[in-house]
Amino acid sequence: MEETKSRFKRICVFCGSSSGKKPSYQEAAIQLGNELVERRIDLVYGGGSVGLMGLVSQAVHHGGRHVLGVIPKTLMPREITGETIGEVKAVADMHQRKAEMARQADAFIALPGGYGTLEELLEVITWAQLGIHRKPVGLLNVDGYYNSLLTFIDKAVDEGFISPMARRIIVSAPNAKELVRQLEEYEPEFDEITSKLVWDEVDRISYVPGSEVATAT
């Protein structure tokens, strides 16, 4: 497999602990893992070995890249079966899980998933809107899985609840190669008010040692 140098050191992938009903979801998880390997990008994810989480982590690990799984201790019996993949970091709760994954990553990608995936996705979008980080956020919109969510967000823009600038935080594409390419080209935007906000959590969430990705100041 030919490797391509990326601006990202590590990408956080949000996805389901289930595999979904369509084979295309499973294929997309594997393709995303392979794309990260091709671009020499490491993975941080929710730490499970089942569902789409298991597929993407196995693809990255088998391709020779580092895998960091962050998982609450309570969920380990449920989401980890058999041999673990890569490095597993146990944390106390869901809040620590999200903060640690965000701190470790240079960008975020959401594969299809359920409530947990949506909650993680929307939180990092909100953090970007508030200027807590400047990291790209991407939706891998497999077979139009996220079409309804994007329609809802566009409706919120039309009704004045989300600004057009905040809408542009979200990058979406139907396949991994196109999505990662768009994330590589992403440039964050901030309005005058957001750019002046100072957050206590900025350094912990936005700074990753050795990263070439711009962080909030």
UniProtKB/Swiss-Prot annotation:
Q: Which GO terms describe its cellular component?
A: cytosol; nucleus
Residues at which substrate binds: 79, 97-98, 114-120, 126
GO terms (BP aspect): cytokinin biosynthetic process
Q: Which domain of life is it from?
A: Eukaryota
* Disrupted-gene phenotype: No visible phenotype under normal growth conditions; due to the redundancy with other LOG proteins.
EC number(s) per entry: 3.2.2.n1
Tissues showing expression: Expressed in roots and shoots. Detected in the epidermis of the root elongation zone, cotyledon and leaves, in trichomes and pollen.
SUPFAM superfamilies with a match to the protein in the record: MCP/YpsA-like
Q: Which InterPro entries match?
A: LOG, LOG_fam
Do the record's keywords include Oxidoreductase?
no
A Pfam family hit: Lysine_decarbox
**What keywords is this UniProt entry annotated with?**
Cytokinin biosynthesis, Cytoplasm, Hydrolase, Nucleus
Q: Which reaction does it catalyse?
A: N(6)-(dimethylallyl)adenosine 5'-phosphate + H2O = N(6)-dimethylallyladenine + D-ribose 5-phosphate; 9-ribosyl-trans-zeatin 5'-phosphate + H2O = trans-zeatin + D-ribose 5-phosphate
How activity varies with pH is as follows:
Optimum pH is 6.5.
One Gene Ontology MF term: cytokinin riboside 5'-monophosphate phosphoribohydrolase activity
- Name the NCBIfam families for this protein: Rossman fold protein, TIGR00730 family (TIGR00730)
Enumerate the PANTHER family for this protein. Answer: LOG FAMILY PROTEIN YJL055W (PTHR31223:SF70)
Functionally, this protein is described as follows: Cytokinin-activating enzyme working in the direct activation pathway. Phosphoribohydrolase that converts inactive cytokinin nucleotides to the biologically active free-base forms.
- Say which family it is in: Belongs to the LOG family.
Q: What is this protein called?
A: Cytokinin riboside 5'-monophosphate phosphoribohydrolase LOG7
- Native source species: Arabidopsis thaliana
